[in-house]
């Protein structure tokens, strides 16, 4: 088994995680927005590694489970045996992509744009996460505290990670709606669990939470005798604002051009495997949650509840090119550094 292999078990979600009986504090870099995150290098158990195996990497959040499903159920492994590993931080991902240690990985979609604009020979293959973010709010008299962005602007809100994906998405949506985000009552935390604690304590009215943290919030609130809800679906808000499907092209599988040249048959089979994995996860949420719970520091119950709201996908990036470029354009307008100084051209997208 790889030196990266770890199994994580969560015992206390009030801002700490328990890992092999050792307490580790969440750190900002170890959690990816879209998305939200786990902390430490992990390896999903597919096959014993050997020098000839390929390695597919993923973030420490639920979409990486699709790689594990594909490894167990799919046909690509019969063409080239492969191992699935989890990068523990954006820094590890970037270093691996730059030094060649990582040639195939699920990445935040803006990372693909940034690398491409730096002149790196990479292609965005597909979109595997269409967004995981929700606005949690209390319920009073059968109604959620907020029902629109305009409502949200009148209440206090906690967001994990200042100037990271959840924050950036909301800033763009406020701007599109003609709302002044700088005037909003926003608090930031260094970790998602801290945002959850702040919200459940009643110190803020609402919280911007990714799955499966949103589902965990619902479970914890119920334990405390409180009623909360997914008051706003950030993906739905994005679709309405930009006249697209109710999704955000948050993360996808990236390949280096060298990997593509050497593994064309494998990639074609993997494409079908991942599409099948999406369907399998929807048909088998409990089994998917059981698999995810072995590697992500969340209770299986929260994972099972959150997976149906996690918007897994395996959409070819080139097939929604315009939608992704719109996403990049908005990110670039907010902060040009996010996309590497410019909006990438269509050469970023993989085409067979």
What are these regions (language model features)?
Residues 260-334:
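Secondary-structure end/capping motifs
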């Amino acid at each position: 088994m790889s030196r990266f292999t770890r199994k994580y078990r969560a015992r206390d979600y009030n801002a700490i995680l328990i890992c092999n009986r050792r307490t580790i504090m969440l750190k900002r870099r170890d959690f990816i927005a879209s998305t939200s995150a786990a902390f430490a290098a992990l390896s999903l158990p597919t096959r014993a590694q050997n020098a000839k195996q390929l390695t597919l990497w993923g973030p420490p959040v639920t979409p990486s489970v699709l790689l594990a499903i594909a490894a167990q159920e799919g046909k690509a492994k019969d063409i080239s045996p492969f191992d699935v590993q989890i990068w523990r931080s954006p820094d590890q991902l970037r270093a691996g992509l730059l030094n060649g240690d990582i040639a195939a990985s699920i990445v935040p979609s803006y990372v693909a744009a940034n690398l491409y604009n730096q002149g790196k020979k990479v292609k965005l293959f597909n979109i595997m996460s269409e967004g995981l973010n929700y606005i949690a709010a209390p319920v009073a008299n059968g109604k959620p505290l907020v029902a629109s962005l305009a409502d949200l602007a009148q209440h206090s809100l906690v967001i994990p990670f200042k100037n990271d994906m959840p924050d950036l998405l909301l800033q763009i949506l406020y701007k599109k709606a003609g709302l002044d985000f700088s005037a909003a009552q926003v608090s930031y935390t260094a970790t998602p669990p801290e945002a959850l604690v702040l919200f459940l304590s009643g110190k803020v009215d609402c919280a911007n939470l990714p799955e499966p943290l949103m589902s965990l919030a619902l479970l914890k609130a119920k334990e405390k005798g409180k009623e909360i809800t997914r008051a706003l679906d950030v993906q739905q808000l994005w679709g309405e604002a930009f006249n697209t499907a109710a999704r955000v092209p948050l993360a996808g599988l990236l390949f280096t051009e060298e990997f593509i040249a050497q593994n064309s048959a494998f990639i074609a089979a993997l494409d079908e495997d991942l599409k099948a994995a999406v369907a399998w996860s929807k048909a088998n949420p409990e089994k998917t949650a059981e698999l995810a719970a072995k590697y992500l520091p969340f209770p299986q119950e929260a994972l099972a509840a959150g997976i149906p709201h996690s918007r897994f996908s395996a959409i070819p990036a080139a097939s929604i090119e315009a939608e992704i470029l719109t996403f990049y354009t908005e990110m670039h307008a907010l902060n040009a550094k996010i996309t590497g100084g410019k909006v990438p051209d269509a050469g970023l997208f993989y085409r067979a």
